[in-house]
Amino acid sequence: MPYNVKEIVANKPSRFTAGHRMCAGCGAPPAARMIMRALKPEDHAVVAGATGCMEVSTFIYPYTAWTDSFIHTAFECAAATLSGTEAAYQSLKKQGKISNTTKFIAFGGDGGTYDIGLQSLSGAMERGHDMVYVCYDNGAYMNTGIQRSSATPKFADTTTSPAGKVIPGKMQSRKDLTKIMVSHHLPYVAQTIGYMNFKDLYEKSEKAIYTEGPTFLNVMTPCPRGWGYPTDMLMQINKLAVDTCSVSYTHLRAHE
């Protein structure tokens, strides 16, 4: 069904609001805003945020940038916490104690997803919980000082893999987490970029949220501090990432 993304943005309320403390030029806030806009207006959402840039900058008690329910979890626990929340919701719904439609969405950075939280993510996906896990991937542990993660590209310069005379940056290749999630035989897996093709991000978010069962979105979200670009260059950095095939637009449904 054809539609105009500009009309969607204009007519749907923002569930990720202004007033957060994310850095200027960060790719994560516009990605989170568009993902949350993919929800139907009448549906409620429970969001779990793993400790990281997005959580510490958008949910500082008593302030929040989220209009839906939000759970702050430890670095490694977003998928586990949300899977338990979803299971409790399903139980209460079967008992007739609640009737509203609630969607469950987890957000974690690449450090909390590729590395520290991979075990709980794999478990939640394998068990078949009806939830979406979103990895906002900026290629390193940016919140704690730009340390390398398994999402960091080979030869990238970080504080724990400094490019210089001894080593030319990170020596290991980047982990293909999207392919790992595909191997879990999920009903929907997608990869995209957070700030350039909003139509692609919106459509993939909508499919992930409204496909029954566990789904996964891997969204590249550049970081001006870690990547070293001027804050007004976010759009150009995203375009370069696509043009140079650093990130690819991919998605896979269970029947494909």
Task: For each feature predicted by the language model, list its residue ranges.
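Short gly/pro/ser/thr-enriched loop/turn and capping motifs at secondary-structure boundaries
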Residues: 55, 138-143, 224-226
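Cofactor-binding active-site loop characterized by glycine-rich and histidine/acidic residues
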Residues: 2-133, 146-156, 170
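Conserved small/polar residues in nucleotide/adenosyl-binding loops
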Residues: 250-256
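Conserved thiamine diphosphate
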Residues: 7-10, 99-100, 149-210
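Short, well-ordered beta-to-alpha junction loops that form the rim of enzyme active sites
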Residues: 50-52, 219-222
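Short, conserved beta-strand edge motifs with alternating hydrophobic and charged residues
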Residues: 135, 190-192, 216-220
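Gly/Ser/Thr-rich active-site loops/lids in small-molecule metabolic enzymes
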Residues: 235-249
